[in-house]
Structures are given as C-alpha cells and as structure tokens.
C-alpha cells in the first residue's frame, strides 16, 4: 500500500485561476492555496491563465522545484462553473486536448496576439490530470 507521504513526494496540485489585475484577488487565491495545502498535505501552486503571475507554465515550474520526484499534477480550475476557460483554454494551456471545439476559433488557429498563441508551453513529462471546475 502506498503511503500518503509517498504520494506527496510524487503528486502536486495546480489550482488554475483566470487572473486579475486587482491586488486582493492574488491575496484570496494565496489563501485558498494555503488552505488546500494544509488540508491535503500536497504541494500546491496557483497558476493564472493571464494578467497575473505566475502563469500556468510558471506554476508548473514552481511545483517541479518543490517536488523533485514529481510524477503527476492534478490541475483544478477554480471557477464556479464549466465553460470556455475550463473546457478549452485551460486544457490547451496545460498541453492537453480541449474538451470541446472552440466556438471563438473552430479551426484552432488563434490570432498571433491571442493569449493561447503567446502563452508559455508547460514543460512537464509526467501526467497532468485535469479535474472539473471546483464550483458547485
């Protein structure tokens, strides 16, 4: 049987947020991150789709540094409901297949200045499991 400590040495949590320019948003997400870490014991980072830092790719780098034997990242969108961000943007930013066709750009070729075109690629060789939005 695998112990919780063994799992903590191989699995980390990525909480994914849209991002905001409002300073209290970062404070709120750091509080959520700290509560999640305390409740689960797993290394936890917040990654932002846009506007705020760290980016999703940057948060993955932070997790890789914190958990040297990292094999799996469980990504949890901190959104109230599923939608374009949780079904298309976040999977794409994580290097996963979108869960549906993007009605904004059905061919998947985004303009050069679109955030999905300019975002950093996630550099992770392990598994990434994307859970549904954390909302109700």
Each language-model region and where it sits:
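Active-site-proximal alpha-helix that buttresses catalytic centers in soluble enzyme cores
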Residues: 1-136
